[in-house]
Amino acid sequence: MTQDTIGGADYANRLVALQTARWKRWLGVQVPFRWNLRRLAPGFTLDVGCGIGRNLLHLRGHGVGIDTNGHCVRVARARGLVAFTPEEFAESMYNRPGYFDAILLAHVAEHLAEGDTIGLIRRYSLLVRPQGQLILICPQEAGFASDPSHVEFMDIERLARIASHTGFPPERSFSFPFPRWAGRLFTYNEFVLVGRKPAGSGRQAGQPE
């Protein structure tokens, strides 16, 4: 993944065009995905790689977004959401241990090498309270092939490994909205994995006790 690919105005404009298409509003394309995210009950969420804020809107703004694309951050703010670049977030009131109930990475990990995804989650893992959630959502085969900025295909096994290596042992995983076989044909079929930080966990995964 390069900054030229996802870091500029063109990528932000592409997200706006995709997410605000009139036919998608008419058909209610986001309704099942909104329902799915809400039923996970993430609480106050840190949305890492928030884009223009689709999932923050699904959560009724109950969270904070971070994105490396400043153009996306500006669009999210214009939609009434709280969003920052990583540098801005580091100086914000939200950058505090245990402040969040969950970290969400939705359609982010496939843009990174596995090790980079692990590093990204570790960077923010201390901000999640004990027993808080890590929610990972990634496209299946058809969705992965639909975007040239995708780098690594992330199936449930890889997502489970990422969650385990970042201090959020996997709790459940599933295919959504259709069974696993549909992912080879349906662009919007997703892998969903939920990990949970153990009670009393204070240190960051990978740090010595």
Regions found by a protein language model. Name each.
Residues 1-104, 116-121, 174, 189-192, ...:
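Conserved N-terminal segment of class I S-adenosyl-L-methionine
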Residues 107-111:
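Short catalytic micro-motifs in class I SAM-dependent methyltransferases
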Residues 118-130:
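A short glycine-rich, Lys/Arg-flanked "PGG" loop and its adjoining helix->strand segment in the class I
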Residues 131-139:
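Conserved beta-strand signature within the Rossmann-like core of class I S-adenosyl-L-methionine
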Residues 143-158:
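Acceptor-substrate binding/catalytic loop of class I
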Residues 151, 187-194:
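Short hydrophobic/aromatic beta-strand or adjacent loop that forms the aromatic wall/cage
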Residues 162, 180-185:
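Short proline/glycine-enriched turn/loop segments at secondary-structure junctions
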Residues 168-179:
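Conserved S-adenosyl-L-methionine
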